Amino acid sequence: TFYASPAATTIRSWVERTPKGFIFSLKLPQEITHEQRLRDSTGASETFFERARELGGKLGPILVQMGPDFQPGELPALVDFIGRAPSDLRIAIEFRHRGWITDGVLALLSEHNLALALVDGRWIPRKLMLSLAARPTADFAYIRWMGPNRDLVDYSRVQVDRSREVDAWSDAIEELSEKVSHIYGYVANHFSGHSPSTARDFQSRLGQTPVDPDLLGEQMSLF
């Protein structure tokens, strides 16, 4: 949904075609975050949120991913957007400029129960992100493991050993789980080369039963 807001009929078809218990995580369209930069976006935002509600109980968090060129000088646009954010939806905001990580911004997010997206990537140091995991700004948490390896092109196997990072984040998640009701985690292939393997590593480290890939059917298409 980052590239365009789906039609309501499309979203309803997702509900019908996915199994019970399936949870969707959406991303606010780039038209709002990157083109309009949150300014004058009331109509587009309200349309997107209304369509997201079509998912009903299958709707998980909505990510508002801002680009690295969205800088603290644009705080008024952020404040206005946050003031309009619907309280019935779980919304996480991702900053890729370190200047946004301030006590004031964290307090603003907390006031509106918006999660600061915790991202292990190349924009903000991992050490800082891990420390922020101990200071959740909402009653849920949103974590993305992106990785810095944008040159990886083979996604069929693990190519980077991330066991130390998995251990560090697992410790943070165990502590975080005592402070929030839900933790949503998403792994990109650029993190280790093969995101399903990384997800299984996290499951094992956190005492969960890893999903056996041999038991999975062919991945469905939503389009």
Spans of model-derived segments:
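Residues lining hydrophobic/aromatic ligand-binding pockets adjacent to catalytic sites
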Residues: T1-F223
